[in-house]
Amino acid sequence: MIKFSATLLATLIAASVNAATVDLRIMETTDLHSNMMDFDYYKDTATEKFGLVRTASLINDARNEVKNSVLVDNGDLIQGSPLADYMSAKGLKAGDIHPVYKALNTLDYTVGTLGNHEFNYGLDYLKNALAGAKFPYVNANVIDARTKQPMFTPYLIKDTEVVDKDGKKQTLKIGYIGVVPPQIMGWDKANLSGKVTVNDITETVRKYVPEMREKGADVVVVLAHSGLSADPYKVMAENSVYYLSEIPGVNAIMFGHAHAVFPGKDFADIEGADIAKGTLNGVPAVMPGMWGDHLGVVDLQLSNDSGKWQVTQAKAEARPIYDIANKKSLAAEDSKLVETLKADHDATRQFVSKPIGKSADNMYSYLALVQDDPTVQVVNNAQKAYVEHYIQGDPDLAKLPVLSAAAPFKVGGRKNDPASYVEVEKGQLTFRNAADLYLYPNTLIVVKASGKEVKEWLECSAGQFNQIDPNSTKPQSLINWDGFRTYNFDVIDGVNYQIDVTQPARYDGECQMINANAERIKNLTFNGKPIDPNAMFLVATNNYRAYGGKFAGTGDSHIAFASPDENRSVLAAWIADESKRAGEIHPAADNNWRLAPIAGDKKLDIRFETSPSDKAAAFIKEKGQYPMNKVATDDIGFAIYQVDLSK
């Protein structure tokens, strides 16, 4: 016993002599979507609100504030802007360096992971792109279908030289692991089916963290391209960050995917979230928005007093590049990065400026969430015409009526960007305008759905709206921003219908039934008659919707055919063809849907948010289907309009 005590004492003395404290900063970008420049290619104008060339200034400042730092990217990097479109159209051969990696290499990133949109262009394109990165990538849950092994390096433990508080050099073994939503198997089925499988995010991290610790990792950092939800855990959940914070051995979570900001007030009600400290169940976590509008910063203090490194203090924050309230830039351009990107930036501007046709009228999306809209109409017109031409001569498909489903993609972001609306002016149209009207490189897929399924599809779309109390005169918000993504608000053309917002939603934002007796879709007709529940229809949509299986009438068993063409290319070709045939396109909405009139003797105060611009105000005055008047501006900058649905 005496001998044991002496040994223990010697160990404690040795640990005390070698004790050190290290401050480590982990910085993160996420969901850059190829927005390298502070430039809005859709409007052909500079911006102070996004772009890595501005985030770079925050990165440089954050680095200079501390002795020890690392920088990670959380994915959705190579897709999502006209720069990405330009590179995809140009093609990326072996040896070519994608502009995003010219930028990230210049900023000396430490490690990166993959987002779901990395798979949009196929595995070969992704492989060629990743070859240009001068830093390693990790992903643990995408599995090679042939070898049954991880397709990418699942995790990495990097020996990192740091300086402790006494100025002495120490070595930290920092472990990085990456994960991506399993839903990529549906979203990019054409690119991934038979080539990869994807495992559950939480179980993957739970499996690997002990292994990383056994191999010597002093710190474990999870790069999770996944959002934050407090819903009960489900296997293969898309948004799994909350569950990751409950896994022992995880020291920091750098996340994204949801285009939101954590820590932030939107997440204050989640149990276990400390917005002041930036922690989830005690684990520091950060999600820095999108397009470089924020830099994520996690600060860890580590001590090895016990003989091994342990986190003793932790906090996280998301630093903005722009002060929305005061309309002021908080980050200057990084001139070195601007110069690095100049040639690709100029080429992108040329690429999106190619003329494709003409429009007889303006196309703005200011009212796309409250009435039928020209920006959605032209997409549906193009998709419907494409499918009707495609099925000619097919004895099985040609006899079926064609419908088309499209959603508004630019209607204020996730209620975080009052400038994010489609603004296509009448006159000459370019590829820039087609890309503005259809943001994503989705491919056109056609599903076969029954009349009953079309009705249920629309019922899920109607979850876009909050339930309105017809007996209340208090202000009521019409748009369900928190529980429903606007890109799921499908408008189906080829049928006519009304949406009764006084009824409860039948489905939640994930198309899970929540009120079996509720029905919001009223007066659904096809060719002027009530739709036959048993009649079959072809519905043109995109690969995300068709393969996702979330909406009624979608999923593998419903696929009628998969076209080789992107929806955006279909739209551009339709604009060109119509302009050749008729001189210009006429993008007026056909008003096949509307919000059902709310009867009653009370004057309701129903409100919705949209762009605060004078252009929006003029458009609303001219094109509004219901009486609308502006009553306020919210703290983010959205204009708040009151709408009269009594008629």
Curated annotation (Swiss-Prot):
Family, as annotated:
Belongs to the 5'-nucleotidase family.
| Xref: PROSITE patterns | 5_NUCLEOTIDASE_1 (PS00785), 5_NUCLEOTIDASE_2 (PS00786)
Cofactor(s) recorded in Swiss-Prot or TrEMBL: a divalent metal cation
- Enumerate the InterPro entries for this protein: 5'-Nucleotdase_C, 5'-Nucleotdase_C_sf, 5'-Nucleotdase_CS, 5_nucleotidase/apyrase, Calcineurin-like_PHP_ApaH, CpdB_N, Cyc_nuc_PDE_nucleotidase, Metallo-depent_PP-like
Q: Which organism is it from?
A: Escherichia coli (strain K12)
Pfam families linked: 5_nucleotid_C (PF02872), Metallophos (PF00149)
Protein's name in the database: 2',3'-cyclic-nucleotide 2'-phosphodiesterase/3'-nucleotidase
- What are the top taxonomic ranks of the organism? Bacteria, Pseudomonadati, Pseudomonadota, Gammaproteobacteria, Enterobacterales
GO molecular-function terms, A-Z: 2',3'-cyclic-nucleotide 2'-phosphodiesterase activity; 3'-nucleotidase activity; metal ion binding; nucleotide binding
Question: What CDD domains does the database record attribute to this sequence?
Answer: MPP_CpdB_N
Kindly state one GO CC term assigned in the UniProt record: outer membrane-bounded periplasmic space
- Any idea what job this protein has? This bifunctional enzyme catalyzes two consecutive reactions during ribonucleic acid degradation. Converts a 2',3'-cyclic nucleotide to a 3'-nucleotide and then the 3'-nucleotide to the corresponding nucleoside and phosphate.
What is the uppermost EC class here?
hydrolase
Q: Where does a divalent metal cation 1 bind?
A: D31, H33, D76, H259
